[in-house]
């Protein structure tokens, strides 16, 4: 019904209420959209059985080359209902000989290589045979430089270590990546400044605790390593000239 109103300045006007009018194009589009959704739901029902399976999107397996640096291997005893600190970034994790050998092998001078990510990997193995228990792990990425972590803590909301008893943590900060392109030259300038300026400026320094769900004290072989995810670039020009090159 039209809505009549009187305006003395312009005379009688007619105002129509558009509440009951629909755009014809909109009606057709909505009908096609509903039809498409119904067909899409029928198609999706064919894949309902696959909902019982899990597929992990693991950046560790993505593009790039993985270069592993083993920091140390050692045996630790872990008491029940407790977790032991295994990574505290003391001097033994950064032995100059270990790092020099790693950089020489993994970052040759002839390539420009960018560090896309760094993973801390802890591989855990029971030293005694016929033991039936699962490994537990807990970590923190950010902590104050003055904070001194406890060597042993009680088990509080840990996560179970997954496949192959390997616990892996991405250390990349928000945004990811490392701006240094020529790792070899940066390392050879100064070992100490390389670790502090290149590694810890761009990646987190985590603390990691390991435990078990066993009711007895267990002896664990722990291997801790850093895995560098590397993107390689071809050099702009050869570094050597002559018939041998």
Curated annotation (Swiss-Prot):
Pfam family, one: Polyhedrin
Domain of life: Viruses
Chain coiled-coil ranges: none
UniProt entry keywords in alphabetical sequence: Viral occlusion body
GO cellular component: viral occlusion body
One MF annotation (Gene Ontology) recorded for this entry: structural molecule activity
Family (UniProt): Belongs to the polyhedrin family.
Known role: Major component of the virus occlusion bodies, which are large proteinaceous structures (polyhedra), that protect the virus from the outside environment for extended periods until they are ingested by insect larvae.
Protein name: Polyhedrin
Organism: Bombyx mori nuclear polyhedrosis virus (BmNPV)
Chain's gene name: PH
């Amino acid at each position: 019904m039209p809505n009549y109103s009187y305006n003395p300045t312009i005379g009688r006007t007619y105002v129509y209420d558009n509440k009951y009018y629909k755009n014809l194009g909109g009606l057709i589009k909505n009908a096609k959209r509903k039809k498409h959704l119904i067909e899409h739901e029928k198609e999706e029902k064919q894949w309902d059985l696959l909902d019982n399976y899990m597929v992990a999107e693991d950046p560790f397996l993505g593009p790039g080359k993985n270069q592993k640096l083993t920091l140390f291997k050692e045996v630790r005893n872990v008491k029940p209902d407790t977790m032991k600190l295994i990574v505290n970034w003391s001097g033994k994790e950064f032995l100059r000989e270990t790092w020099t050998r790693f950089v020489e092998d993994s970052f040759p001078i002839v390539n420009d290589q960018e560090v896309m990510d760094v993973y801390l990997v802890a591989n855990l193995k029971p030293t005694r045979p016929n033991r039936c228990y699962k490994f537990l792990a807990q970590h923190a990425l950010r902590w104050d430089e003055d904070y001194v972590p406890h060597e042993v803590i009680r088990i509080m909301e840990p996560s179970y270590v997954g496949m192959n008893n390997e616990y892996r943590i991405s250390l990349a900060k928000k945004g990811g990546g490392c701006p240094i392109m020529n790792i070899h030259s940066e390392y050879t300038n100064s070992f100490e400044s390389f670790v502090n300026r290149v590694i810890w400026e761009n990646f987190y320094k985590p603390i990691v605790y390991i435990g078990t769900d066993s009711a007895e004290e267990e002896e664990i072989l722990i291997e801790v390593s850093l895995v560098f995810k590397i993107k390689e670039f071809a050099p702009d020009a050869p570094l050597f000239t002559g018939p041998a090159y």
